[in-house]
């Protein structure tokens, strides 16, 4: 089954998933949204509002995170976890808040 993405381009499921992931990482300049490190090969997508807490796999609920940050955050509330980190940065917190949609921000 093909999946349509913007501009009418059709991709198979694997290609669509890869493109979806790459676009989010690219929009964040290939950097971890939390610690701002270069993602390199450790790129993951973190559900801002964890799936276990009702979060969806939607671009505005996903941010790139290095493997270390993603594992350490786990399903915790992102702001609470982020503010406890030595690398917390108000500018990055604002970027995350601007990225997530209002429904996600209210639920988090």
Locations of regions flagged by a protein language model:
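Short, charged surface segments at domain edges that flank catalytic/cofactor-binding sites
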Residues: 1-31, 90, 97-104
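Solvent-exposed, flexible loop/coil residues
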Residues: 5, 52-53, 82-86
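Generic anion/oxyanion-binding catalytic loop in active/binding sites
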Residues: 21, 51, 70
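Histidine-centered nuclease catalytic patch
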Residues: 34-64, 76-80
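A detector for short metal-coordination/catalytic motifs
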Residues: 60-61, 68-108
């Amino acid at each position: 089954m093909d999946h349509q993405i913007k501009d009418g381009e059709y991709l198979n499921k694997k290609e669509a998933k890869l493109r979806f992931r790459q676009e989010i990482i690219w929009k964040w300049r290939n950097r971890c949204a939390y610690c701002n490190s270069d993602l390199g090969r450790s790129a993951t997508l973190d559900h801002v509002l964890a799936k276990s807490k009702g979060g969806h796999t939607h671009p505005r609920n996903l941010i790139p995170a290095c493997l270390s940050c993603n594992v350490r955050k786990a399903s915790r509330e992102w702001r609470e976890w982020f503010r406890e980190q030595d690398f917390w940065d108000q500018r990055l917190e604002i970027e995350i808040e601007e990225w997530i949609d209002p429904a996600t921000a209210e639920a988090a």
